[in-house]
Amino acid sequence: MEILAALEPSPFPVISLYLSLTSNEVGRGEHQIFVRKVFNERAKGMAAESPERESFDKDVARIQDYLEKNNAAEGQAVAIFACTGSDLFEAIPLEAPIGEHSLFISSVPHLYPLAKLVENYPRYAAVMLDTNKARIFVFGTSTEHEETIVGEKTRRTSQGGWSQARYQRRADNFHMHHIKEVIETLEKIVRAEGLEHVVVSGAEVAMPIFREQLPKYLADKIVEIDAHEDGESGSFVQRTMAALRKKDAETDIEKVQELMDAWRSGGLGVAGPEATLSAFQLGQVEELIITASPESLKPVQKMPDDAARGDLQVVTSNTSGQADESRVKLSDELVTRAHQTAARVRFIEDASLLADIGGVGALLRFRI
């Protein structure tokens, strides 16, 4: 995303297209209908045979070709950024869901929806665990890789007494060895990948051993979910993502309180769109804290002189009304500046938590 954020504004139209690839109630995707409709409408507003129209038409053809060839591709969504005039074409398959189709046309890529997905669905490890087998996945906005660990299965005999006790000790030893191996592998993955979250779905008999053997630093990253009979990773990843989203929402209040305390004490915090934009210009922002609903942002009187020039066109499949383009542009300007300056981004789902400060604020690296 940092590469897209670093692109200079283009004199040609830059297309940012976000599509849900999930099927409707009759098993058919609706994204192609949306694409044809919005592209035809946008083309009518451009002068025929102009350089801008030529670039746009080539982008549309390339996007449609990509969608036709990747119609059966895995994933719940896709984000596509295209501008032939600026030699840009980037298609990003996404495992995370998108609520609605949306098209943005501007002088730069529109990154707010992608940044929101990345923050809401961070890269994390997920574990399916029982006493003799484990599957460890690394998920992000797409499924990245999987590792399977198989322990030795124990077979129960019909003998009782001393033989039964020996069997149980032997089984317990195998279970302990297997789970220790799982934890060792998980530790290596978490350290190598720099992961902050681990979601575990474990058999009832395995989880007490797993919890007991976890080192504290790893235990602090664990989110547990109930065990289900997930045959494939598809339903499993959806359940793990939902668990992370719930956990994230629970900590939103704490993050907003941290911001408010820093701001009110005159410390390392600013509140409101204008103050946050000014802090970005001075290189102060450590973490952007912004509403997950752009329509709840307070508009600014004037965008910074170095903001992306030109208008922003927005079309979505949302039937409840079109977005306020000035607020959408402001939200993207803030998020893009965060990625340009290596600032973290935190989206707050409950818009009311940031309502008193215009929907956005920032924790700072330093004061001036």
Could you say what each language-model-derived stretch is?
Residues 1-368:
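Terminal alpha-helical anchor/extension segments at protein ends
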